[in-house]
């Protein structure tokens, strides 16, 4: 076997290993997003209408404010990944129905962004509030922001004597908690 053939084989092997790593990274961010998406949607649906105006103290964002914030942030972030950042105006909405509709619209935009990400394009540049960033970085940024927001929303749910969705599922084979 000549050196050229060996170098070509090594190059092909390295390329396929790189693609597997990229595919794993893309699968991980999609899986992570789907988990927090479920938590946020279930939390927004669980909180009763009168809980949407609940704040734990002066100067705090209301529960509905958190839902609106997630919707607007996702519309901007995932819209940027999709090539058209948007503002839904959800921060000004107050009714549960309007906020849930905006939240679902923002998740549709994010579904498109996450599903459109592949091992081939995950490093491509997309527009974000930081300027041009790699697509995968914007997706992980969106996921991380969603996690932070869900953490705050879960506290509001507990303050209303309800059980956050992620905790409720712990007694159903996920985690070690008892859930309700």
Name these PLM-found stretches.
Residues 1-7:
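Bacterial N-terminal signal peptides that target proteins for export
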């Amino acid at each position: 076997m000549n050196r050229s053939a060996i170098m070509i084989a090594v190059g092909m092997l390295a390329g396929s290993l790189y693609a597997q790593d990229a595919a794993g990274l893309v699968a991980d961010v999609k899986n992570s997003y789907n988990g927090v998406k479920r938590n946020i949607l279930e939390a927004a649906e669980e909180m009763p209408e009168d809980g949407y105006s609940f704040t734990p103290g002066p100067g705090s964002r209301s529960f509905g404010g958190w839902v609106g914030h997630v919707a607007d942030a996702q519309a901007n972030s995932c819209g940027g990944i999709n090539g058209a950042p948007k503002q839904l105006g959800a921060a000004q909405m107050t009714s549960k129905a309007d906020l849930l509709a905006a939240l679902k619209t923002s998740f549709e935009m994010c579904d498109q962004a996450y599903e459109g990400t592949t091992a081939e394009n995950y490093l491509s540049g997309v527009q974000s509030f930081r300027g041009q960033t790699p697509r995968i970085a914007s997706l992980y940024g969106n996921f991380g922001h969603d996690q932070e927001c869900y953490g705050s929303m879960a506290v509001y749910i507990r303050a209303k004597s309800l059980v956050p969705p992620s905790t409720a599922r712990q007694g159903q084979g996920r985690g070690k908690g008892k859930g309700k």
